[in-house]
A protein has these predicted regions:
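Helix-to-loop junction immediately C-terminal to a conserved catalytic motif
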Residues: 50
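The feature captures the beta-strand-to-loop junction immediately N-terminal to the Walker
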Residues: 35-37
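Membrane-spanning alpha-helical segments of multipass transporters and channels
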Residues: 223-226, 292-556
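Conserved ABC transporter NBD signature motif
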Residues: 57-67, 72-74
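Conserved ABC ATPase "signature" region
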Residues: 96, 109-126
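ABC ATPase C-loop
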Residues: 147-148
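Hydrophobic anchor residue at the start of the ABC signature
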Residues: 144, 172
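Q-loop/switch helix immediately C-terminal to the Walker
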Residues: 82, 87-104, 113
Length: 556
């Protein structure tokens, strides 16, 4: 059913090959074991066949050369070593999401298929259990259920029995045998426990990146001149890879397999994928459900959303009332007038520093919220996304779901910051422009950090880079520290804090707060509309990074 010829697989383009000219054939309706010492290239071989890793050579499906990756993935599913599912979803919810993301199904069919899938893998009694509460063996069985949601013809399993107790291992193997015997599936399973080889129809041996045997267990024992399969790895270590390759090339069994031709079935009917809009709805529903179930995430988000505005209020209440006393009425003689003006200028300078600082403080806090919103959103679940994309999830639907969620969250935090501070501190200025400006700051920084999360594989790297990005916002804005003239308009277009600060301040032109600030700095300030336009450009750049990063394959 599935075969490869002269397949060479590399961890990345231009790197040293990990699998060298491998040829293997996995017949239809069989349970096939893929074995070899640790690090020999078993998983790499599977990933090369699936195009997860760059490869050279020929892949055949039903005896036909593969014409596209999509044609392969319509019939072949990949079950990784560790189940990739959201821990905060229940078992039934995980299966439901898989069905709705990969197939066009109605509600009645979904319910029926969920029951069928969970019964098939022995999780019928665990439908309401959170994934994070499952044991290791149950997680592996859930992984099989999720892969079977697309009803594949062939299932490639990467060490799904590794690290399990004997009972759990037997349960997994029983599920795999049932898939072959009762449903006619073809299953290829990477396995380490050589004592279980008697349960497989064929055994494929990989040694130092080369396929050196394929056949039934008795034939393997005869080929390597061993009595027990447990002696295999000791025997392999006695000779070089070249020796075993030459021995297999000269084997009569190898020649018989090369001459055998599997009948070509009719081309499989193309599986209809749900529309991008349908997948988008499923993803948004899942994201909201995950958000409310993750108490730590909810607590942190609420803490910064409501706590940061309180910090602004604490700093504002002690200083802003002094502005109400500012006046410049000409009373008394000439000397008294000069003294009054000097006093006014001193008071205005102090207040200008306070006002400008409070505005930039709000903007910086919103940038920090944006970093928290977006930095780990994709990098933290990259493996899950890549697995779902392989099964049929559209990258565009995934990217749009993240963009909508993160942008709305950031915009909402900006709006709340505006409302809270203005109501409690009676901050002057027009409500509309100030609300839009701070909402734009929150949304743009959230999306920019989301874009970084999409192009970086590690969530830690994405978080660190986002923190650096926020950290440089204040000094490079030119609001607190004066920049050299040559740098002002070189860096300013990229600094969200400047545009948020300027747009917010320009909405206060009718107040003494604005007059106090411009007395100290008479430089050009962007009006709110201009600030929002630049912040919108920042958001567009972040969105471009997001969609580009999601289109690229980045398996962890």
């Amino acid at each position: 059913m599935l075969a490869c010829r002269n397949l060479t697989v590399r961890p990345r383009l231009g790197a040293t090959a990990l699998v060298h000219g491998a040829s293997a054939h996995f017949g239809s309706g069989g349970l096939h074991a893929l074995i070899g010492p640790s690090g020999c290239g078993k998983t790499t071989l599977l990933k090369g066949i699936l195009d997860i890793l760059p490869s050279e050579g020929e892949i055949l499906l039903h005896g036909r050369p593969l014409v596209s990756r999509d044609a392969l993935l319509r019939e072949v599913s990949f079950a990784p070593q560790f189940s990739i599912a959201h821990g905060k979803l229940t078992v039934s919810e995980s299966a439901e999401c898989a069905l709705r993301l990969y197939q066009v199904v109605d509600d009645v069919t979904v319910e029926t298929r969920i029951v069928e899938l969970l019964k098939l893998v022995g999780l019928a009694e665990r439908g309401g259990t959170l994934v994070e509460k499952l044991s290791g063996g149950q997680l592996r069985r859930l992984g099989l259920a999720l892969e079977l949601s697309t009803d594949p013809t062939c299932l490639l399993c990467d060490e799904v029995t590794s690290g399990l107790d004997p009972r759990s291992e037997d349960q997994i193997l029983a599920v795999l045998r049932a898939l072959v015997a009762e449903r006619g599936k073809t299953v290829v399973c990477v396995i380490h426990n050589l004592a279980k080889l008697s349960q497989f129809d064929t055994v494929t041996v990989v040694f130092e990146g080369a396929v050196i045997f394929q056949g039934a267990l008795p034939a393997m024992q005869a080929h390597f001149v061993i009595v027990d399969a447990l002696e295999l790895y000791d025997r392999l270590s006695e000779r070089s890879r070249k020796h075993w390759q030459e021995r297999w090339a000269e084997s009569e069994l190898r020649l018989m397999q090369a001459e055998a031709e599997e009948p070509l079935p009719a081309a499989p009917q193309e599986r209809l994928r749900p529309s991008a809009l349908s997948q988008l709805g499923t993803l948004l529903k899942r994201r909201l459900r995950l958000m409310w179930r993750d108490r730590g995430y909810v607590a942190l988000t609420l803490a910064i959303t409501f706590g940061f505005p309180c910090l602004v209020v604490i700093f504002a209440l002690g200083g802003l009332p002094q502005m109400k006393g500012l006046a410049l009425d000409q009373v008394g003689g000439f000397l008294e007038t000069l003294q009054a003006r000097a006093s006014y200028r001193q008071s205005a300078a102090e207040t200008a520093t306070l006002v400008s600082g409070l505005i930039i403080f709000q903007v910086i806090l919103l940038c920090l919220m944006g970093s928290n919103n977006g930095a780990r959103e994709i990098a933290g679940e990259r493996g899950l996304f890549e697995k779902e994309r392989m099964s049929g999830l559209r990258a565009s639907a995934y990217a749009w779901s993240k963009l909508i969620y993160v942008a709305l969250l950031g915009a909402g935090q900006g709006a709340w910051m505006t409302i809270f501070v203005k109501l409690l501190c009676q901050f002057p200025g027009e409500w509309g422009p100030q609300l839009v400006v701070l909402s734009a700051v929150g949304a743009s920084m959230s999306v920019v950090c989301l874009g970084l999360s999409a192009v970086l594989q590690s969530p830690d790297k994405a978080s660190l880079l986002s923190i650096y990005l926020v950290g440089f916002q204040l000094p490079l804005s030119g609001v607190v520290l004066a920049l050299p003239p040559a740098l002002v308009w070189t860096v300013r277009p990229f600094i969200a804090t400047y545009w948020g600060w300027a747009g917010y301040l320009m909405a206060m032109t009718e107040s003494r707060f604005y007059d106090a600030v411009v007395m100290l700095d008479k430089g050009w300030l962007s009006p709110p509309a201009g600030a929002v336009a630049v912040l919108g450009a920042h958001l567009a750049v972040g969105a471009a990074l997001l969609f580009w990063g999601c289109q690229k394959k980045r398996w962890p």
